């Protein structure tokens, strides 16, 4: 520990220990400071003494105590709840609930022994506490200024640390935890400081019940998918030295096997935790290693906490910090291969409560956030080049999915390892038909009001070119789909799904209306008012873009996954990674080729996929800031809501690919076999 940081830490620790007994702040503020000082003392104890010597029961008790304040049963009376904070503290509610969230991140810093990260947050707490012990309490504006100064003062350090831990394999806390722990002893789960629920415990127990061969095969499917992503993309994996594993606590046995398999490929593993400092957090999404989510409503309530400090000065400051940090670690960035992601699913679908007391972006801040996302994406791509990196994603269920968890898990393993050659051949039949037409019509059935017309690119040489990628199991596991980037001009109509689960959030009766390939109207039925429903979509699908293009049209072919979802009644719990293979899907946002449009991509038959651009991405040639959205959200129409998919040629003649939810194109009949089982 740096001597200067150590000195500051000791002073902060000593002062915080005095707060619960001195009662120097007035009520109602004294209650906040007393409770948070007591919480911070628990964190400091972990920092100083660790968890050595504690048995499993003691570790579980400690974990519960650290997170109990935001658990659903206690959240109504927590200062982490913006509604409660405002009720108790009035106009100060927003600044105190922001502070609460920043304090909450100290749990992880203590477990990782990140002295600097912990110390600067302790000092922030003490600075605000000190202001409230004076004769005259500070105005809300003054408290906000203290918080903004904290963010601005430490922006460079926090951004630099975040970038380095994403690409530097040295001093990697989570990797060391995995490789050095006895994974048969479930007490290892508590070493990270993440919340441990029954899901994480039972997942680890289940993983321990599998043979080493089963674990190795699961890992091999995943790591080979990553390697094949480079091969099919004609990218040189030998130039790369690191891979970033992102996963959910409980899967350590599989991750350990993957780390060893990546080593055989010449890749060292980097694992970073989801962001905790407000400077680095974005929305409610957790990008990186995570444990259980103690309360998704807490994460949702604080998704726009950056509204406290987001202004033009901060945007410039953060972009400058990113640029200087990537300059500093350019060599590490250049040899980084990209992410290998293990997603989980099975949680009870979450429909959030919208709270006016939460921080929320103004219209001006929405534009600033878009600018920040766009510019930061460009900076990242200059150092971790899109045309040289790849990725892979795979998903597994967690025990919360239900009593059939073991059977469902094994079914998903089977789905993740389907015969790709069989699907590749069938999908080529679909592509050959699609390549004969200029338009595709998609219609729903029953109460599904989908009615879309998709405009395809013109092939100048049908012998060497194709519009659709034949996607089996490499970067996107499981197989299979055929997908393209539509021409926006002429693409339009309504996309409608009765229920869909996107980015951890449930959408009911979702409708998107397209014109010239862009969303021009939208609605859902999650909330009572149209205004709330539109805002929900703006926050979580459109991400505040005035218009969002259809970046992808695809036909999913994994009927085995669909039938399994119906058998176990888990369709509403599947991640889009699997759900997108269970019917046609449409992505709003960037194309699948963003930042690498100029890199030729080929199907197994040798044909070049020429539909890598649309009218938006082509703007990069004139002004790259106009070419990308920084988002890509897939929305699937399940087979049981699907009326038809038909091609339309220049003469207006149609060929059916799917009718009444079943494949009818000659050569695709085998895809219907799972329906009969």
Regions found by a protein language model. Give the residues of each.
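Short solvent-exposed loop/turn micro-motifs enriched in small/polar/acidic residues
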Residues: 435, 503-506, 546, 579
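Glycine-anchored, exposed beta-strand/edge motif detector
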Residues: 582, 588, 596-602, 613-622
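Active-site bordering "gate/hinge" segments
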Residues: 1-489, 658-677
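Extended hydrophobic packing segments that form well-structured cores
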Residues: 605-677
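Conserved AWS/pre-SET-to-SET junction and N-terminal core of the SET lysine methyltransferase domain
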Residues: 473-511
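Short acidic-glycine loop/turn motifs at beta-strand connectors
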Residues: 446-448, 514-518, 650-651
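Active-site and channel-lining beta-strand-loop segments
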Residues: 507-524
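Dual-mode signal for accessory low-complexity, basic/Gly-rich regions
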Residues: 522-593, 597
């Amino acid at each position: 520990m740096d001597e200067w940081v150590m000195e500051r830490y000791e002073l902060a620790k000593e002062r915080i220990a005095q707060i619960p007994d001195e009662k120097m702040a007035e009520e109602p503020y004294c209650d906040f400071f007393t409770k948070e000082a007591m919480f911070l003392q628990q964190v400091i104890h972990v920092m100083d003494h660790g968890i050595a010597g504690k048995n499993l029961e003691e570790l579980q008790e400690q974990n519960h105590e650290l997170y109990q304040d935001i658990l659903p049963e206690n959240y109504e009376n927590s200062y982490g709840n913006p509604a409660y904070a405002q009720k108790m503290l009035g106009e100060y509610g927003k600044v105190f609930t922001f502070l609460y969230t920043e304090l909450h991140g100290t749990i992880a810093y203590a477990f990782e022994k990140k002295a600097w990260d912990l110390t600067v947050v302790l000092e922030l707490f003490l600075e605000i506490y000190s202001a409230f012990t004076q004769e005259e309490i500070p105005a809300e504006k003054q408290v906000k200024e203290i918080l903004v100064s904290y963010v601005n003062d430490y922006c460079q350090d926090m951004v630099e640390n975040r970038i380095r831990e994403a690409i530097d394999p040295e001093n990697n806390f989570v990797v060391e935890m995995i490789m050095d722990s006895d994974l048969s002893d479930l007490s290892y789960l508590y070493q990270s400081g993440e919340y441990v629920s029954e899901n994480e415990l039972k997942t680890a127990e289940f993983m321990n019940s599998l043979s080493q061969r089963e674990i190795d095969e699961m890992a091999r499917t995943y790591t080979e998918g990553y390697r094949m992503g480079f091969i099919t993309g004609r990218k040189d994996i030998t130039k790369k030295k690191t891979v970033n594993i992102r996963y959910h606590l409980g899967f350590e046995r599989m991750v350990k096997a993957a780390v060893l398999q990546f080593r055989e490929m010449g890749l060292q593993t980097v694992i970073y935790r989801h962001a905790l400092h407000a400077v680095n957090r974005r929305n409610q999404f957790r990008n990186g290693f995570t444990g259980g989510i103690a309360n998704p409503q807490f994460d949702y309530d604080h998704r726009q906490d950056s509204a406290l400090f987001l202004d033009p000065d901060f945007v410039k400051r953060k972009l400058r910090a990113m640029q200087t940090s990537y300059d500093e670690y350019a060599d590490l960035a250049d040899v980084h291969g990209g992410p290998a992601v293990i997603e989980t699913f099975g949680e009870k679908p979450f429909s959030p409560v919208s709270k006016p007391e939460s921080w929320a972006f103004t219209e001006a801040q929405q534009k600033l956030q878009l600018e920040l996302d766009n510019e930061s994406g460009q900076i990242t791509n200059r150092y971790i080049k899109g045309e040289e990196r790849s990725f892979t994603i795979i998903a597994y269920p967690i025990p919360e999915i239900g009593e059939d968890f073991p059977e469902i898990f094994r079914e998903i393993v089977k789905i993740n390892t389907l015969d790709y050659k069989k699907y590749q051949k069938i999908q080529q039949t679909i592509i050959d038909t699609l390549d004969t037409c200029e338009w595709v019509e998609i219609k729903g059935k029953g109460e599904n009001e989908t009615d879309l017309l998709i405009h395809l690119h013109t092939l100048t040489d049908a012998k060497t070119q194709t519009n659709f990628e034949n996607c089996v199991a490499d970067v996107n596991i499981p197989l299979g789909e055929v997908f393209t980037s539509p021409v926006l001009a002429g693409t339009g109509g309504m996309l409608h799904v009765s229920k869909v689960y996107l980015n951890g959030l449930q959408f009911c009766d979702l409708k998107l209306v397209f014109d010239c390939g862009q969303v021009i109207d939208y609605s859902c039925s999650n909330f009572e008012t149209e205004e709330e429903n539109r805002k929900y979509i703006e926050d979580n699908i459109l991400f505040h873009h005035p218009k969002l293009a259809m970046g992808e049209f695809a036909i999913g072919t994994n009927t085995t996954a669909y039938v399994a979802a119906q058998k176990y009644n888990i369709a509403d719990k599947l991640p889009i990674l699997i759900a997108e293979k269970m019917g046609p899907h449409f992505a709003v946002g960037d194309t699948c080729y963003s930042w690498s449009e100029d890199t030729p991509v080929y199907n197994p038959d040798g044909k070049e996929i020429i539909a890598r651009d649309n009218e938006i991405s082509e703007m990069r040639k004139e002004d790259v800031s106009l070419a990308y959205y920084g988002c890509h959200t897939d929305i699937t129409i399940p087979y049981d809501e699907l009326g038809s998919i038909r091609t339309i040629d220049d003469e207006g003649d149609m060929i059916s690919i799917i009718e009444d939810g079943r494949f009818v194109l000659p050569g695709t009949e085998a895809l219907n076999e799972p329906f009969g089982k």
